[in-house]
């Protein structure tokens, strides 16, 4: 009644965005600033969200850097003690290309070169040899816990339902999504890591500590 006089709006359909291929060369950039410690960030192009390729990369990145039982944390922080923190995660995007991130923070007063080299060795090992069945099972359990925690809250559950309604015109998919992830095999995760998470496909950002003038 209040808006009946307004003309209807017929939005144009946005054309699908072609996904970007993985980088074919390493792209690096260095930035200096007054940061607490030196750090290195890695980035990769990943498949669009809600595909088996993205979900498998998400599990692979969880194996690599999801929590204190992950490869990066266990090797760099606990075993070699060359970093104060290390982790990895995936960022899902529906428009063409998602991306994955890994990061390491150096020890206070040191540059990140040693931690970066150790991280690249772990990234290469994952891309070359793949994860173990036990690592994939842990990553799935972690994903399931986070997913069910989100569904247990009415506000985040509503957000997920609206997400699948808006992005895929399929709100019921929220009930199937966990099964899609749980059905991925270790071989599938290894295949995704080899295809999208190799060291030679990365972008790298190095944060260096700026010299103190005092």
Language-model features: where?
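Short beta-alpha connecting loops at secondary-structure transitions
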Residues: 102-104, 124-127, 173-178
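C-terminal, helix-dominated tail/subdomain
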Residues: 162-173, 181
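Non-catalytic beta-strand/loop surface segments
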Residues: 5-51, 62-114, 135, 139, ...
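Structural motif
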Residues: 49-55, 155
